[in-house]
Curated annotation (Swiss-Prot):
Catalytic function, reaction form: (S)-dihydroorotate + H2O = N-carbamoyl-L-aspartate + H(+)
Protein species of origin: Synechococcus sp. (strain CC9902)
Subunit structure: Homodimer.
Gene Ontology MF annotations: dihydroorotase activity; zinc ion binding
EC number assigned by the record: 3.5.2.3
Protein's UniProt name: Dihydroorotase
Cofactor note: Binds 2 Zn(2+) ions per subunit.
Binding-site residues for substrate, renumbered to this chain: H16, L17, R18, N42, H137, L220, H252, A264
Matches recorded under Pfam families: Amidohydro_1
Similarity comment: family membership: Belongs to the metallo-dependent hydrolases superfamily. DHOase family. Class II DHOase subfamily.
Length: 343
């Protein structure tokens, strides 16, 4: 195995950058590793207007050094009463790259999300017509559905009807966690894709309970059984262009993360690419990493491939237990790869 690999500069197709002081702390990790990132809109209040997206984009850009060459790609937060005209205007003005569907109360700051798909029928028709991607947090929230089954049930109950009713709509099922999601996306046409996180390639649901209750491994969707983790690895490393990188890095301050009712989210941004590289190397699939990290996403979104390269050097790197007051994924572990600056 080579001691060095070079990749076309990658993108992160799903990240939470937060806002305010938290944004200033976390955005450098993403902006110095990736050239572009799809930024989630679940702020308080959520990003539901073109003006709000512009203001948020300005806040992100202000926190970045110009030499990083980073471009945030903004998304709209869909609600029951969002206007189709606002979505279309934001897309045509180059402000909204995509729109995000959060089922109401499915995850962090999703209380204002969509309660029933019929409420956004007009929006989805417009998005289908103009070629605007729909990004989906694919879980049902019914109390009678087991938390480990919520993604699989969502596919049957909601995603299949969306695909049937809006066949021309471009859809990304984000941060997939199940074999069912892999199979559904893998059997679909070019209008359906999925992002895969680094943590779901490394952990199964046992990680949350290893030696106690491990809140730093709690995210939504939750990690599943080992067979699902292995299915995600096969998908990510298959070379199938329907699967691409999306970290879902989701930082939370430690008091909220480590409380009796801890927040869902894993902060993986500081070492995301090294984490992916470790997984791909473990399965002897490093030759598939560039397509997953740098090529498949732009192809789906209809964007140019980045210029420049990044280099990963085989060199042990100890992950700190805490960075900027946040606990990172792989805290206390040694990663076998080290990212060199983008050129």
């Amino acid at each position: 195995m080579s001691d060095q690999i070079q990749l076309i500069a990658p993108d992160d197709w799903h990240v939470h950058l937060r806002d305010g002081e938290m944004l200033k702390q976390v955005v450098p990790y993403t902006a110095q590793m990736f050239r572009r990132a799809i930024v989630m809109p679940n702020l308080r209040p959520p990003v539901v207007t073109v003006e709000a997206a512009k203001a948020y984009r300005d806040q992100i850009v202000a926190a970045c050094h110009p030499n990083w060459g980073f471009t945030p790609l903004m998304t709209a937060y869909l609600t029951d009463d969002i206007a189709p005209e606002e979505i279309e205007r934001g897309f045509h003005e180059g402000v909204f790259t995509a729109a995000k569907l959060y089922p109401a109360n499915a995850t962090t700051n999703s209380a204002a999300g969509v309660t029933e798909l019929r409420h956004i029928h007009g929006v989805l028709l417009v998005m289908e017509r103009i070629g605007m991607p729909l990004l989906i947090h694919g879980e049902v929230t019914d109390v009678d559905v087991d938390v480990f089954d919520r993604e699989a049930v969502f596919i049957e109950r909601s995603l299949k009807p969306i695909r049937d009713r809006y066949p021309g709509l471009k859809v990304v099922l984000e941060h997939i966690t199940t074999e069912q999601a892999v199979d559904f996306v893998g059997s679909a046409d070019q209008n359906l894709a999925a992002t895969i996180t680094p943590h779901h390639l490394h952990i199964n649901r046992n990680a949350m309970f290893a030696g106690g209750l491990r809140s730093d491994f709690y995210c939504l969707p939750v990690a599943k059984r080992e067979r699902h983790r292995l299915a995600l690895r096969r998908a990510a490393m298959s070379g199938d262009r329907r699967f691409f990188l999306g970290t879902d890095s989701a930082p939370h301050a430690r008091p909220g993360k480590e409380s009796s009712c801890g927040c869902a989210g894993i902060f993986n941004a500081p070492h995301a690419l090294e984490s992916y590289a470790m997984a791909f190397a473990q399965d002897d699939k490093l030759d598939k990493l560039e397509a997953f990290a740098s090529l498949h996403g732009p192809a789906f979104y209809g964007l140019p491939v980045n210029e420049g390269i990044v280099t990963l050097q085989r060199d042990d790197k100890l992950v700190p237990n805490v960075v900027n007051g946040l606990v990172p994924f792989h805290a206390g572990e040694t990663l076998p790869w080290r990212l060199q600056p983008c050129t």
